[in-house]
Amino acid sequence: MSANSVFQQLWDKAQCTFSTKLNELAPFSEREQQFFAFSPFATEHLRVNPHWLTEIRQTPPVSDEWQNYSSQLKQQLTHVDNEDDLMAILRQFRHQQLVRIAWSQFFQLCDTPCTLKQLSVLAETLISVAKDKLYQQCCQQWGTPCDREGKPQPLLILGMGKLGGLELNFSSDIDLIFAYPENGVTQGGRRELDNAQFFTRLGQKLIKVLDQHTMDGFVYRVDMRLRPFGESGPLVMSFAALEDYYQEQGRDWERYAMVKARVLGAEKKEYCQILRQMLRPFVYRRYIDFSVIQSLRNMKSMISREVRRRGMIDNIKLGAGGIREIEFITQVFQLIRGGREPELQSHSLLTVLNVIAKLELLSAQETSQLADSYLFLRRLENLLQSIADQQTQTLPDNLEDKARLAFAMGFDDWQMLYQQINQKMQAVSVIFTQLIGEDDENEDEEDVSEFKRLWLLGRLPDSATLFHQGLTAEDRQAICQTLQLFRQDISKRTIGPRGRDVLDALMPKLLAKVCLQPQALVILQRITPLLLGIVSRTTYLELMQESDEVLTHVVRLCAASPMIAEQLTRHPLLLDELLDPHSLYQPLPLNAYQDELRQYLLRVPEEDEEQRLEALRQFKQAQLLRIAAEDIAGVLPVMKVSDHLTYLAEAIIHAVVHQAWSYMVKRYGEPAHLAQRDGLGFAVVGYGKLGGWELGYSSDLDLVFLLDCPMNILTTGAKQIDARQFYLRLAQRIIHLFSTRTSSGVLYEVDARLRPSGESGMLVSTIQAFDEYQKNEAWTWEHQALIRARMIYGDDQLQQMFARTRHETLCLARNATVLQQEVREMRQKMVQHLAPTQSNTFDLKASSGGITDIEFIAQYLVLRFSHQYPALTRWSDNVRILELMAKYQVMSEQEAQLLTQAYVTLRNELHHLALQTLPAVVDGDCFITERQWVLSSKQKWLDE
C-alpha cells in the first residue's frame, strides 16, 4: 500500500480525536490534513490549543523565528513569581514551539541544520530563562552569592552533546553540567549560605522545573551524569574544582563529551571565556593525540554490545553506519588534531567536516558522503520523534509510522525509503571502519607473539629467522640485555597501568621491526632513550602503537641518524611529523618557508610571546627533521640541504624581527623618520655559513645589524626614546628571542662579533658608519668575511646601500703581495689552532687541503681581482665564486671544477658525519685525491 493511501486513513483517524473548538476551524487545507495525519503529538496539542493552529495560519513558521524565543518567553513570564506558574508556562511554550517546528520541518520550510538550530535554541532559551528567574528568587530568599571581593557570582550551565553543538533532536534528553566561578558566601539574605550550597539549591530547583512531570507534561529530561564523578559527585562545582578534576582525573570519554560543551545563554560574558579557556587544554592537546582512536574504538565496541544485548534492530543512531559513527569520525579528528588545528575546535559537526576536507584529512568525496548521510539521518530522526514526541532512533515496525516516515521523507513507499537508509548507513560504515577499525588484531600475530615473550619474559625467540641474518648469537643476547636494562630504567619512572598496557602492546611490534635491521642493537640503543623520555606520556606511546607508519619511520630514521634519534628524544612533539610520509620526504619549495611559517604562527595569539617563541622552535625542529629525512633518503643533494637550512633560517629571522619590532613599537612607538621613508630603517646582514648559503644542521648564525636613521630622532609613542637607542634595543630583543631557552631549547645561537670593531663596537651600526669602517679601518680578514655577507632582512633602500658598500669595498685596489701574505698568515694561524695534531687524521674543515683552504682561495681571488673584474663580487657562496673565476679566466675551468668537486665531496661527508653526530675528522688516508687538488691550488695562489 502506498504512503499516500495510508495517509488518507490516518487523516480520518485523526479527525475522530478533534475537539469541538478545533472542528470550528474547519475546513482544513490539504497541508493541514497531512500534518494531522503525520503527528499524533501535534494533533493532541492542537486539539487542546486550537488557537495555535490559528497562529500558524496567520503567521506561518519561518526559519529564523528562533531569534524571538527569548523575548517571547520573558514576556510571558513577566508577572510570574511562583514555581507552579513558571513550570506551566515553560511547558506550554515548549509544546507550542515544537508544534511549529514540527510543521516547519514536515513541509521543509527550513533545512535540517536550521531545524536543529531551532530545537537547540528553544532548549537553551527555556533553560536559561528558567535559570535567571530562579536565580532572582533564590537571591531574594538567601542573598546574592559573591566572591571574596563581594563580586556577584553567576551559575554557568554547560550544554553538552547535541545541545552544545546546536544540533539537538526533536525529543531529547539534555545533558548539563553546572559550575560557578569562585567560592564565597551569599550577601543580603536572611541567612548566609556558602556559594556551593546556594548553587546546589538553585541547580536542584532548575532540574525540578524542567524535568518534573505535571499535568502539562515536562520541559526536558535532564541528565546530570556527565558531571565530574557522575551521580556520586556534587551537583555544582567551582571553576577551581572543575579544573583540578579534569587535570587529575579526566577520562577519555569525558574529553569526547567536552568537544561539544558550550556555555548556555551567555557565550560572550567574561566568566564564559574563563571557563572555556580552562577546559580547552583538557579537550585539545597541543600535540597530535592518537590515544583517542583506541578509546573511541572501545566506546564503539561497548555501544555495539549494548545494541546487541538490548536487541536493537534498525537503530539509525547507534547501529553500524548510524549518526553516532559520523559523530565519532568528526570527533576523532577534533581530539587528535584540534590542539594543532584551531579550525577543528568547532561545536558544529558540519563545520568540522568542511575543515576536515579543507585540511585533506579525508577526501572531499568522503566528507561529502558523511555530510549527506548525516543530514538524511538527522531529518529522518527528527521526523520519527515528532510523530509522538518520543525519544527513539529505532525505525518503526508498524505500517502507520512507516507510511508517515516514507511520505515525510518524499518516498512512495517504505521499501524505497528503507533501501535508501541502508545505502546511506553502509557508506558511513565503510568510512568509519577504514578510519577507526575494529577492535581486533590480525597483523603478523605469530611473529609479534614471539617478541612479546622477549619483551615480557626476556626469552629470545626460538627462530633465528625473526632476526636479520647478519646478527650473531652475541648480538641477540646483547639485545636481550639492553631490554633488561630498559625495563629496569622504566621501573624507576612513574607510569600508570594504561601506560604499561600501551608499552606492552608497542614493544613487540617495535622489536619485530628493529630485529630485522642489520644494526638492530645500535637502533635499539638509540630508540630506548626516546621511549624512556615519553614513557610517562602515554599519548606518544599510543601514537607509535596505533600507527604502524609512524613506528616504521621512527625505526628507519633512528637507524640512519643518532642526531634524529636525539632530536625525537628531546622533542617528542616531532613524532607528529612522521604521520604524513608524503610531506616528510617531499621538500618544501625554497621560497615557501616564509609562508609556511606565517601560517604556522597564525595558530598562536600574536600577543602571547611565550607561545610564539615555542612555536618558532617547534617549527624549526619540524623542518629540520624533514630536511634530515630528505637528506637520508637521498631526495636532497648536499648543496640543496644547505639551501633548505638557509632558507629556513631566513624565514625564522624575518619572523623574529617582526616579533621584536611589534614588541618595541608597542612600548615606544616607531622612529619618527619612518614617516618619510619606506621600510623599517633596519637591516640584518648574514655572514659566514648563513651568508654563503652553507648552513649545517647545528650551525650558529653570524649576524650584523645595520640602521638608517638621522641623529636626534625620537620615537612616536607615549614613552619616547632616541630612535638609535630604539634600534639598539631592537637588536638586543632579537638576540634575546633567538637565545632564550624554552622547553624546546634555543632557536639559534647568534654570534654578532663580526660587526665593526668586533665585541668592542656598537651592536647596531649606521649604514654610513659601516661604509666608513669597511673602506678605511677593516682588516683583511674582515674583508674576507664581507665576501660571504649578504642582507637577510632589510628594506630596498638599505639593501642598495649595503650592496654598494660591499661591492666598493671588495673592489678596492690592493697590493697583491701584501694581500697574499695577510691571507696566508691568517690561514696558518687557523691551522695551528684548529687542525688536529695527529698525523693519521684529517679534519675536513681545518686541516690543510680541507674546506677552509678552498674558502681562503676563493676569498683571496675575490679580493685580488675584483678591482680588475668587478663582477666577481656578485655571489657570497664558494661554488658560484669559483664559477666566476673560471668565467673571467682568473683560473682555468679545470681548476675551478676540481676545487668545486673537492668542496662538494668534503661538504657531503661533513653532512653525513653531522647526521651521525660525529666530529668532522676522518682517517688520514681519506680523500687523498681531493686534498691534493686543493693543496695544489693553495700552493699556486697563497704560497708562491
Swiss-Prot record:
Species annotation: Proteus mirabilis (strain HI4320)
Record key words, sorted: ATP-binding, Magnesium, Multifunctional enzyme, Nucleotide-binding, Nucleotidyltransferase, Transferase
Short name of one Pfam family: GlnD_UR_UTase
Protein name as catalogued: Bifunctional glutamine synthetase adenylyltransferase/adenylyl-removing enzyme
Cysteine disulfide links: none
Catalyzed chemical reaction(s): [glutamine synthetase]-O(4)-(5'-adenylyl)-L-tyrosine + phosphate = [glutamine synthetase]-L-tyrosine + ADP; [glutamine synthetase]-L-tyrosine + ATP = [glutamine synthetase]-O(4)-(5'-adenylyl)-L-tyrosine + diphosphate
Keyword Magnesium: yes
UniProt GO MF annotations: [glutamate-ammonia-ligase] adenylyltransferase activity; [glutamine synthetase]-adenylyl-L-tyrosine phosphorylase activity; ATP binding; magnesium ion binding
Annotated InterPro entries: GlnE, GlnE_rpt_dom, NT_sf, PII_UdlTrfase/GS_AdlTrfase
Cofactors that this protein relies on: Mg(2+)
